[in-house]
Amino acid sequence: MSAVRLVDSHCHLDFPDFTGQVPAVLERAAAADVAHLVTICTKVTEFDKVLAIAESDPRISCSVGIHPHEAAEEPAVDTDRLVELAQHPKVVGIGEAGLDYYYDKSPRDRQRQVFATHIEAARRSRLPLIVHSRDADDDTIAELQAGAGKGGRDGRPLTGVIHCFTPTQKLADAALEIGFMISLSGIVTFKNAEALRQVAKSVPLDRLLVETDSPYLAPVPKRGKSNEPSYVEHTAVFLAEML
């Protein structure tokens, strides 16, 4: 893909799979024409580690936030603190935050509380919100619409991306109406992901992003291996040929 420079919009370079490997990962990413990476925070208590990785190379940016799996275990973080941390120039988004009713690792009321805090932080910082949603479409839509409604009243719009998107059409339509982007991972290349491919075809090209969510979800033809940012090329090529 020598004519195109790619961005891996969502990876986790602070995870153990990448310990001591970031320089080599960046080298392989460059060889695949991946020009930039966004490494995503899942615990505010580990934000310093995420930020240090981002500061190690100009090709890496980061986010700040609490994954819904961690909502119950992480110390309470209010909107002011998230906005404060987001002032660092390396921070380009709030999250990943959201709702996960598939694993339910945190109580649902706690997940919604933490998600609402991140939504407000994204509005106040004017940074995009990075949303994780699994088996929680209705509540995710309700929270996002509430945040978007506030933005319509006070001039601080809510922007963001639904990361590692998996169907339904309902969530895609609601997110697009609010003004969000849709980010597709290697899942879209999987044989059993026809429903996702059909939803992807409904998303305007200028609202689509690609990501790895590495070290997870390696795309075909790398499926079964530990994922890494260079593999975003395979997802991008697959989508280009499909769309």
Q: Locations of the language-model features?
A:
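Mid-domain alpha/beta scaffold segments of enzyme catalytic cores
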Residues: M1-L243
